[in-house]
A protein has these predicted regions:
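Glycine/Thr-rich phosphate-binding loops of Rossmann-like dinucleotide-binding domains
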Residues: 48-50, 87-88, 93, 172-175
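Rossmann-like dinucleotide-binding cores of NAD(P)H-dependent redox enzymes
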Residues: 68-69, 74-78, 84-154
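FAD-site-proximal beta/loop scaffold in flavoenzymes
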Residues: 57-73, 162-202
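N-terminal Rossmann-like dinucleotide/flavin-binding domain of flavoprotein oxidoreductases
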Residues: 1-34, 113-139, 144
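Conserved N-terminal Rossmann-fold NAD(P)-binding element of oxidoreductases
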Residues: 40, 80-81
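Phosphate-coordination loops involved in phosphoryl transfer and adenosine-cofactor binding
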Residues: 11, 35, 58, 73-76, ...
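Short glycine-rich hinge loops at helix-strand junctions in the catalytic core
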Residues: 43, 97, 127-129, 182, ...
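Glycine-/small-residue-rich beta->alpha transition segments that form the dinucleotide
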Residues: 30, 35-37, 41-47, 67, ...
Length: 202
């Protein structure tokens, strides 16, 4: 469909080099392209916080991307984060028979939802066997063990064949060359106005 509409797709890592007399200069896959207008669509990626032990845990730690590529169903799964994505996977793996434990920093799951709805859903999930540890802050990962502190200051832990990091997402802006155009960022994301325009014309 793209080709039929005279749209060329170039696969590779694109980087903005700056402005020239030919327009905005972009390099990708060994080629240089020029544009009058530039649309940034770099998307977002799962945020993995720098919790001690994360790197050492290796492929025990997964995000919403890697968990879909698993070759074997985990017998147990610890999910760090009780937001929408975390609860989707909690429900899915619970229905397959995986033992699921959710560790959430807030006092409720699905933080953006109405409190009554959140409580109702938590009750439904709990009756299906999902374990919840709310008001808990993760302090360390020890292999397949998630160490956390509860609201009373007690240190506890939960083990899983896999640990799903589901604490949010962040904009992909590293390496795109935004600094070469002077694009302003806001907490790592490209800053835009109410019409999705950046501080740089075009």
């Amino acid at each position: 469909a793209m080709k039929a509409n005279k749209v060329r797709v170039v696969r590779g890592e694109a980087k903005v080099k700056g402005r020239s007399q030919n327009g905005i200069e972009i390099e990708c896959a060994g080629e240089t392209f020029y544009a009058v207008n530039l649309l940034l669509c770099t998307g977002s990626e799962a945020f993995v916080p720098p919790i001690p032990g994360v790197k050492e845990a290796g492929d025990i730690i997964v995000t919403n991307r890697e968990i879909l590529d698993l070759k074997e169903q985990p017998k147990s799964l610890v999910i760090i984060g009780g937001g929408v994505i975390g609860m989707e996977f909690a429900s899915f793996f619970n229905s397959l028979g995986t033992e699921v434990t959710v560790v959430e920093m807030l006092p409720k799951i699905l933080g953006g939802l109405d409190g009554e709805i959140s409580a109702m859903l938590q009750d439904i999930y709990a009756k299906k066997g999902i374990k919840f540890n709310l008001n808990c802050k993760v302090t360390e990962i020890r292999g397949n063990e998630v160490v956390y502190v509860d609201k009373d200051g007690q240190t506890l832990s939960a083990k899983g064949d896999k640990i799903l990091m589901s604490v949010g997402r962040r904009a992909v802006t590293a390496g795109i060359g935004h600094e070469n155009l002077g694009l302003e960022l806001n907490r790592g994301a490209v800053k835009v106005d109410d019409k999705m325009r950046t501080n740089v014309p075009n």
